Amino acid sequence: MEFDCEGVRRLLGKYKFRDLTVEELKNVSVSFPHFRYSVDTYVFKDTSQKDLLNFTGTIPVMYQGKTYNIPIRFWILDSHPFAPPICFLKPTANMEISVGKHVDAKGRIYLPYLQNWSHPKSAIVGLIKEMIAKFQEELPLYSIPSSNEAQQVDLLAYITKITEGVSDINSRGWTNHENKILNKITVVGSGDLGIACTLAISAKGIADKLLLLDLSDGMSQGTMDLDIFNLPNVEISKDLSASAHSKVVIFTANSLGGSESYLHAVQSNVDMFRALVPALGHYSQHAVLLVASQPVEIMSYVTWKLSTFPATRVVGIGCNLDSQRLQYIITSVLKVQTSGKEVWVVGEQGENKVCSWSGRDGVLSPSSQAQLSSRAMELLKVKGQRSWSVGLSVADLVDTIINNKRKVHSVSTLAKGYYGLDNEVFLSLPCILGTGGVSEVIKTKAGEDTVTGTLQASASSIHALQQQLEL
């Protein structure tokens, strides 16, 4: 079948990089001439919809001496080729999905090639070649008896409506045990912050296994040093599937450099997370996702939307470090006779953070609290947020989560419904943390007009930026 360049060009319509996409699909047709192209509505996890080019067909997979034609579907995002395709199996009525390392229960395909996608070195032809190689190791589909076909038709009707997501269904081909690892933690990103988190968590001794996912090309200096000095229970990998069964997955990776505007910088982070979060959520379906990537409020929201996890299991590091410092300043530097544990820094990381009291501290009058907060916040401003200090703060949060300490931390959580907020935004609020993430948001003092006004202003600006992002 001859590739119809002009027909595909018309289908691409308003795609940003139409010529590049047409050229790549033309190359695909040389090896796979029978793919069929169309434009259909793609439903994202946040229920938003977009008309996207997609193509379907089969790829030949040799398994145990026999060739199987595996039906697949590729969705091409409008930012292609700078964003990877979204890939699904397309089983017929007599086929059933075999959930495994690279396929979830809804047929979505996860591969290292997708996670490491980078134009121009990445291409759909290369992706298909890796797909074939992985499926030769573990066949993603198997036939079902004819008596079960009616049931499968219903399932397929459901699958066609589902485009993304994580299922907690335990199906054949996927291990049902936890590999006998009690406390496994994954750190995503091998930059300075990722290394700092790895070292701080290792020093606390709270992980039976600690995995550092290195997303860089080649080996970074930090990961090379970790390899050389061989920390106990620490493993370095580039394979996302190595993170399977983690109790906490920590996102430290950032892709903010070289962008022409703040919006473009944040969008580049979102694009990276689009390839990471669904796969990592698939491999660790009961994990708490701890976000340290910047801007933490927005990236926590993005992680929540892409993972489809309950909001309680997506936690941003928020103002935990500033809160711990503030409490230390009040009790140890200013020598105030109070526990210091009833005051937190809340809101948005950066200049818009604000001090808030829980109302349980009966030692200080409201006016004394206000004066103390002002003095303490002035001292707090001289403190930076270097990687090692953030790493210690992350380790503190992980310790509370892993050991179910139910301590109060000021962390980024879904703030809708608090302080009169109506939008889905993440802001730092005092929360009780445990193995399930956020179990409760602590109420602070009523009538704090400054706090309420600051949080509402932050929420408004964050929501406005989120509306401009492409998830």
Curated annotation (Swiss-Prot):
Domain UEV stretches: 2-145
Gene name tied to this protein: Uevld
SUPFAM superfamilies: LDH C-terminal domain-like (SSF56327), NAD(P)-binding Rossmann-fold domains (SSF51735), UBC-like (SSF54495)
GO MF assignments: oxidoreductase activity, acting on the CH-OH group of donors, NAD or NADP as acceptor
Similarity-based family: In the N-terminal section; belongs to the ubiquitin-conjugating enzyme family. UEV subfamily.
One Pfam match: Ldh_1_N
Protein name: Ubiquitin-conjugating enzyme E2 variant 3
Assembly and oligomerization: Homodimer.
InterPro entries: L-lactate/malate_DH (IPR001557), Lactate/malate_DH_C (IPR022383), Lactate/malate_DH_N (IPR001236), Lactate_DH/Glyco_Ohase_4_C (IPR015955), NAD(P)-bd_dom_sf (IPR036291), UBQ-conjugating_enzyme/RWD (IPR016135), UEV_N (IPR008883)
Binding site for NAD(+): 191-219
Example of a GO biological process term: protein transport
Role: Possible negative regulator of polyubiquitination.
Keywords: NAD, Ubl conjugation pathway
